[in-house]
Regions:
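Cleavable N-terminal export/targeting peptides
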Residues: 1-34
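Transmembrane beta-barrel domains of Gram-negative outer membranes and organellar outer membranes
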Residues: 27-217
């Protein structure tokens, strides 16, 4: 995601999150929840017009607790807008807003055979705790391919820290049932290099409500 390199530092030891998602404000019923949390990789799914999705999560690490919120809204076919914020509370300190991100997600290709689905994500990041370069912009290209039934591979390549670093992710996702799924993921930034990995489980309570649990370092 947009704050990948910051996440590497923030979760240098461990991460435990639980995310809740709520579905559509429109009359549509054919769309299932496909979250962009809690992993670092951007998926290729884009919300249909007038659909609102709320993604909320809480987490903990060796240095702080945090709470993140993402609002996703389908603007027109193949395009959604997102607003994401992160509140952080150090173990010794006050609650503070560490990141605020406005982003757009554009579906480029839905995928066909062995040609993967492709989505382009653009970010405008505001980091009030940074002394310099508080406002930055980044881009990410997301690719997703189903390998066999129930098993998919998602890869991201993009920029980080205002186009100053390269970010890469690779994620394998597996659906055990229609409701229960899992993922294992590598993520990293380069220049200089930092690496991490995480894994998680997701369970669809209903078609419009999903909970997830993840951990990593």
């Amino acid at each position: 995601m947009c704050c990948l390199c910051k996440s590497l530092r923030r979760w240098s030891l461990s991460l435990l999150t639980c995310s809740l998602l709520a579905g559509s404000l429109s009359a549509q019923t054919d769309n299932e929840v496909q979250p962009d949390r809690p992993d670092h990789s951007e998926g290729t799914s884009v919300l249909s017009p007038r659909r609102l999705q709320i993604e909320w999560g809480i987490g903990a690490s060796s240095g702080a607790h945090n709470m993140g919120l993402m609002l996703r809204y389908g603007l027109v076919p193949d395009l959604e807008l997102r607003l994401e914020g992160l509140l952080q509370r150090p173990h010794r300190g006050a609650v503070q807003v560490s990141d605020l991100t406005l982003s757009s997600k554009l579906a480029l290709f839905s995928g066909d055979g062995w040609i993967p689905a492709m989505t382009l994500v653009g970010y405008l990041n505001y980091a009030p705790l940074e002394e310099a370069r508080r406002v930055t912009g980044d881009l990410t290209l997301a690719l997703e391919q189903e390998l066999v039934s129930g098993l998919s591979l998602t890869c991201n390549i993009g920029s980080a820290e205002g186009m100053r670093r390269l970010s890469l992710t690779a994620e394998l996702g597996y659906n055990f049932t229609d409701r229960l799924s899992s993922f294992v993921e590598y993520y990293g930034v380069f220049g200089p290099a930092e690496h991490g990995c995480d894994l998680g489980l997701s369970y669809a309570v209903t078609k419009d409500f999903l909970v997830d649990l993840s951990c990593g370092r």
